[in-house]
UniProtKB/Swiss-Prot annotation:
It comes from Rhodopseudomonas palustris (strain BisB18). This is Ribosomal RNA large subunit methyltransferase H. GO terms for cellular component: cytoplasm. Pfam families: SPOUT_MTase. Belongs to the RNA methyltransferase RlmH family.
């Protein structure tokens, strides 16, 4: 199963980018042995529109253009479900076992995701009630993808 992360905003050089790349590489290495490919990262520049509704709409159009019809769409949203790591791993493993071609994880911009994208999502995940910068959300998502792979493989990284 191909894993893709679509994120509004670009990670600049620095510790967040290095940490994100570390977890991306770890998932890629372990994930291949488990039937996963990726994660591919698609960065979309933030809209420069003057008002939030227009920014959200422009960003949603750019995101939607990257989502194939039969992909499982997962949004990262503060209103989403709070899953523990084992539950997240079960979801990811379940989609793989159902021969899902792609799982697309979407991280919105500062104004959030459009209601249409949120409605289309098979799952919406929250990393808690706090608002997180998109750079941190990307690192946390990539770490959880790697952690899910370790759980699915029986690797001792996850100690619960």
């Amino acid at each position: 199963m191909r894993v893709v992360v679509i994120a509004i905003g670009r990670l600049k050089q620095g510790p967040e980018r290095e940490l994100a790349e570390r977890y991306r590489e770890r998932f890629d290495d372990l994930g291949r042995k488990l039937g996963f490919r990726g994660p591919e990262i698609h960065e979309i520049g933030e809209s420069r529109a003057r008002d939030a509704p227009t920014r959200i709409a422009e960003e949603a159009a750019a995101i939607a253009a990257l989502i194939p019809d039969k992909a499982v769409l997962v949004t990262l949203d503060e209103r989403g479900d709070s899953l523990d790591s084992a539950g997240f791993a079960r979801k990811l493993g379940g989609w793989r076992d159902q021969s899902t071609a792609q799982a697309i994880f979407v991280i919105g911009g500062a104004d959030g995701l459009s209601p249409e994208l949120r409605r289309k999502a098979k799952l919406s995940v929250s990393f808690g009630a706090a608002t997180w910068p998109h750079q941190m959300v990307r690192v946390m998502l990539l770490e959880q993808l790697y952690r899910a792979a370790t759980i699915l493989s029986g690797h001792p990284y996850h100690r619960a």
